[in-house]
Amino acid sequence: SVKRHFTDPSLACACLALTKEKLINDLNTFGFMFEALVERDLKIYMEYLNGNLFHFRDNVTGLEIDSILEFNDGEYAAVEIKLGFNKVEEAKKNLLTFKNNMIKEPKFMCIIVGYTDVIAKDPETGIYIVPITALKP
């Protein structure tokens, strides 16, 4: 589905006069800015790979997936973006529900997080947990 993305989420932070302290005390806004930052980076990577970035929303069930990465070979990946650890289980559930409802399974599924420096793979689900710091050329 169509979803508008910030070109640079720092513009929103500047317009709202958000400081580090304000963001730490408003995790909801911090989460939106974090998601926008990750989506910006994913869009740049997908453009480099001649792919596309989409958002998924099922209008019947309400299920949403933050990012669908469509590769130029027709494969795709499903990505959830979560700032905090407390949202990872919910993200796993969303990804598994999505996978189980698709005719063609995603090439991979991952959750991009803001709280660790270690890339991990959940042994039960195969879902990767990837820190934002891993998003680099």
Model feature map: region roles:
Residues S1-P137:
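A cross-kingdom feature that marks ATP-driven nucleic-acid transaction machinery
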